[in-house]
From Swiss-Prot:
Organism whose genome encodes this protein: Homo sapiens (Human)
Gene name tied to this protein: LINC00322
Region Disordered, annotated ranges: 15-34, 143-195, 221-246
Organismal lineage: Eukaryota, Metazoa, Chordata, Craniata, Vertebrata
Superkingdom, taxonomy of origin: Eukaryota
Protein's name according to its UniProt entry: Putative uncharacterized protein encoded by LINC00322
Bias (Basic and acidic residues) ranges: 172-189
Length: 302
């Protein structure tokens, strides 16, 4: 019902202004082009990509998924956002054109990210090389491009982090555990044990001011550049650098922030092949291919 004001100034009730409920249209909920990590309900979904968004990327028209796909689940929303826009659709001779009204079902995340699928004709240079997002096999060094260690038409083995703890900074890195140096840096948060976290869980894990100090620990932009320079100056130039290219791998801190796939940063720069110490330039993924190319890294080094 709506309240109408007549020219005489008398308020009347319009009983015919209510929209009649249609059972056919009320079943379909409106779907919006929402970015990753923006909807708590979608984060806690049952682990399916939202196939209602079918618009391809304007920058990459060869992709089927949109630039802002719905998250697969809260533990891999960043990988879903990156894979949805930057992995081209595999060309298969059995692929038929979509008929009007038909829905294209995306492959599961393992196939989408290219976990040892021989039929997935994806160029290895399209796979974003983030140690936490796509950890390479032991045969591949961290500084080596992914395309140099894989066969043509295939992509490397991807290892996703295990979801064992609710804290984004729980646990220490394997190298600190192996060398016994984890007790020294216990006051500072180590690598996140997993990529993304539900906002409610992030609030619960904000004890000791971890969530409030994440920008000071893992800053963005020029702050990360100056921080990495200070770290390199403070580190001794000794022969036992404890595999510095591995220990300085990116640590994503903003995966539970809004628009995580647009604002993610890392504590240390990406390793460049042929350079023993990482470049002082920070790495940011917004989007990763464009940002890393602007930093002087080619697509084969991502």
């Amino acid at each position: 019902m709506a309240l109408l004001i007549t020219p005489a100034g008398v308020a009347t009730v319009n009983r015919h202004s209510t929209i009649p409920s249609d059972t056919h249209t009320s079943r379909e909920k409106p779907r919006f082009h929402k970015p990753c990590r923006n909807d708590l309900e979608s984060l806690l979904s049952e682990g399916r990509l939202d196939t209602s968004v079918q618009t391809p990327c304007p920058q990459h028209p060869h992709t089927q998924l949109s630039c802002e796909p719905q998250p697969l689940e809260h533990s891999s929303c960043l990988s879903t956002c990156l894979a949805g826009c930057f992995l081209p659709v595999p060309s298969s001779p059995h692929t038929h054109p979509l008929l009007p009204g038909s829905r294209w079902l995306p492959p599961p995340l393992a196939l989408l990210m290219g976990t040892l699928s021989p039929g997935l004709a994806v160029k290895p240079s399209w796979v974003p090389r983030f140690p936490l997002l796509a950890r390479q096999s032991p045969a591949t060094s961290v500084g080596m491009p992914l395309s140099a260690a894989t066969q043509p038409g295939s992509v490397g083995r991807l290892h996703f982090p295990k979801l064992r703890s609710s804290s984004p900074f729980s646990g220490h890195s394997d190298e600190n555990k192996a060398t016994g140096q984890g007790r020294e840096n216990r006051d500072q948060p180590q690598r996140p044990s997993h990529l993304c976290e539900c906002p409610e869980a992030a609030k619960q894990s904000a004890t000791n001011g971890v969530a409030e100090t994440n920008r000071s620990v893992f800053p963005l932009g020029s702050e990360a550049r100056s921080l990495s320079l200070r770290r390199q100056e403070s580190q001794p130039h000794s022969g036992s650098s404890r595999r510095e290219s591995v220990s300085c791998s990116p640590s994503f801190w903003c995966c539970w922030q809004p628009l995580a796939f647009l604002t993610c940063g890392c504590a240390a720069p990406i390793s460049v092949p042929g350079v023993t110490r990482p470049s002082p330039r920070p790495c940011c993924v917004s989007p990763p291919l464009v940002r890393l190319q602007s930093l002087g890294l080619g697509p084969t080094q991502i």
